[in-house]
């Protein structure tokens, strides 16, 4: 099966629908699937639930989907870099489900592994725990967290071979590998596509069995904040 598509719009063809749930990799703006996010914006899809560590910035990353009010709900860990998000949330126009960062990562990993839920001490005694099942183990209280899956996972990797085996690069790996396993359909944008067999099997981070569609993208790789000083 050919997994390679000519561009981001083609790779999302037939996948986007109103009310869908997406996962979008990245940590801040590092390792985000910027081409696929732009293509999803251009579909006009509405009422999206977006699972992502961050909400992008005002005019980049998932911030593009917030500008056009295509996102209905965010399941995230940190959203403080986006003024558009703040305004919509405080006006009651956007739903938010906060997760501690480690809990968010484990919920995604669990979803990808077919694990419906797990117990954690993180959040016990805080607002995070409200409405969640509590259970004691060995004299300590834990809360139940559920696994997460998405209709479509949007992933950024460094390289892919033609079978969809992926290699990530440094910090840009972040949430991408676990999200690649947790999408009903996983679409990946990469900086380079190579021939199958080019990778040392020990260097592959995500096996191609998890990957459905691949594009070779062009990347701005914007930096959120840059601090400089005089030499």
Regions found by a protein language model. Name each.
Residues 1-231:
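Conserved alpha/beta enzyme-core scaffold
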